[in-house]
Amino acid sequence: ELLATYGEKLVGGEDETHFGRPQDVAFLPDGRILIADGLDNNRIMIMDNDMNYLGEFGSEGSGPGQTNTIHAVAAGPDGRVLVLDRSGGRVNVFRTTDDPAEFAFERSIGDLTLPLDIIVNENDFWITDLGPLRFVNFDFEGNLKYTWLVPRELPDGYIEVHTFSVDPDGNLYGGDNQYGRTQKFVPKAGSDAELLIEPPWVGN
């Protein structure tokens, strides 16, 4: 059952009720909804849990907190919000403030080629990147922890991991929009837990 529709089909815009090719959605523990209105508008729209517009942050550019193409957004611990700048090759980290319509820029992380998606965990985060195709693991200070290269030619290879997630049992799912398939990977017995991607962070 369709409950509501926001925006207008084939009608783009940059006001409070229209979008410019939005790419992703994230949910904050207090119920606010963040919409990555990113291909045309390079902004994160802030909505309450009834989808009323509260404000927005972000703009186009290469300066602090700016983006060239927002492709993903994710919420994390301690009020963090991570915004993935695909064309800018980095992740911008913001923090919530006492004002529900304001977010404070903290830092940019990564020297990436073409980042596509992000999962935030309790102490770090993972990104899929192209050139070479890989999963990249950073802590919240921006320190590189681990790089996991992804094969292309094997039967279970990828051209790009356009989106990915992990279920409560630790199984990894990766969607490839070039090969047109999603694959499931189960952790090997005895795997180092520090090198495994955890399920996305969920606030209390």
Where are these regions (language model features)?
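Eukaryotic scaffold repeat domains enriched in small/polar residues
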Residues: 1-204
